[in-house]
Curated annotation (Swiss-Prot):
Organism: Rattus norvegicus
EC annotation from Swiss-Prot or TrEMBL: 3.4.19.12
Molecular function GO terms recorded: cysteine-type deubiquitinase activity; K48-linked deubiquitinase activity; ubiquitin protein ligase binding; zinc ion binding
The protein's name: Ubiquitin thioesterase OTU1
Annotated ranges, domain OTU: 144-269
Length: 343
């Protein structure tokens, strides 16, 4: 997870939302908590056949299985087929104990890891998607999946909280996140003018605090700045990724998927059940963007999206016919149903 400011990650408490969000100033950069050596983030480089990559979000407490999962996602070499060499002359790491921590291996922050495929082990059969990313059998490589959050008008806020907190589903934090956004907007009326907001600054602040309003691009851009991370939203209708905070130099990125009226968080799941899902990625991890596009393309081909400008659709849960954005919004609000298909 991200290193937190006072009161929790980036000022958001892990549960309950007892007000810690509003204590952090808008745009305040949250640094690593504490500063103990055990929590210091490592920066490792990984050199493989496809080039050199930076591995981030690791520490001396990270387990070997997590390191191998990142390497697999970047290189396409399954953990069981990896050979990792370090030092000069390069020597192979002992990968037999996947629960060992990096601090107990002969590597340190700043090292270059040379990754090769072990030719003595059975190879997974690779296939290349139309986006060009290598994919192996699903049992050996981590995959990107969506996690459903409640359709309660606050799916954007719940989804953002989920990914920045490393997989914590807590819809109760939505009101506090709404108040946070209102506080940030109210603090800078010149930046957040009527021309930007579509309503006066004061009207917007009252509007966003309501629990029946939906968040969108403005709110995502504010949260990107507050959490100091790139927020990538992949659209299932256009199979396009909108990257908020892309040019801000953030080192982390999180991902959401959007179908026209509903947001869900994305996470990377690993084959090993003991390895927790990953929701926070390095901003250098372009493999995860390719995986997100593939997920969106699959949803588009199944017509799991909502054209908000012109559509006739049917609720896939109750089969009710709907026309237009307003009817879809009302139906989702009244029933909690968000799985729509175009007719």
């Amino acid at each position: 997870m991200f290193g937190g400011a006072k009161g929790g990650h980036f000022g958001v408490p892990p549960a309950g939302c007892s007000g810690a969000v509003s204590q952090a100033a808008a745009g305040t950069k949250a640094g690593p908590a504490g500063g103990r050596p055990a929590d210091t983030m490592w920066r490792l480089r990984c050199k493989a056949k496809g080039g050199t990559h930076v591995l981030q979000g690791l520490s001396n407490r990270t387990r070997l299985r997590e390191l191998q999962g990142q390497i697999a996602a970047i290189t396409g070499i399954a953990p069981g087929s990896q050979r990792i060499l370090v030092g000069y002359p390069p020597e192979c790491l002992d990968l037999s104990d996947r629960d060992i921590t990096l601090g107990d291996l002969p590597i340190q922050s700043g090292d270059m890891l040379i990754v090769e495929e072990d030719q003595t082990r059975p190879k997974a059969s690779p296939a290349f998607s139309k986006h060009g990313a290598p994919s192996y059998v699903r049992e050996t490589l981590p995959v990107l999946t969506r996690t459903a959050v409640p359709a309660d008008n606050s799916c954007l806020f719940t989804s953002v909280y989920y990914v920045v907190e490393g997989g914590v589903l807590n819809p109760a934090c939505a009101p506090e996140m709404r108040r946070l956004i209102a506080q940030i907007v109210a603090s800078d009326p010149d930046l957040y003018s009527e021309a930007i907001l579509g309503k006066t600054n004061e009207e917007y602040c009252d509007w966003i605090r309501r629990d029946d309003t939906w968040g969108g691009a403005i709110e995502i851009s504010i949260l990107s700045k507050f959490y100091q991370c790139e927020i990538c939203v992949v659209d299932t209708q256009t199979v396009r990724i909108d990257r908020f905070g892309e040019d801000a130099g953030y080192t982390k990125r999180v991902l959401l998927i959007y179908d026209g009226i509903h947001y869900d968080p994305l996470q990377r799941n690993f084959p090993d059940p003991d390895t927790p899902p990953l929701t926070i990625f390095s901003s250098n991890d372009d493999i995860v963007l390719v995986q997100a596009l593939e997920l969106a393309d699959e949803a588009r081909r199944k017509r799991q999206f909502t054209d908000v400008n012109r559509f006739t659709l049917r609720c896939m849960l109750c089969q009710k016919g709907l026309t237009g954005q307003a009817e879809a919004r009302d139906h989702a609000r009244e029933t909690g149903h968000t799985n729509f298909g175009e007719v």
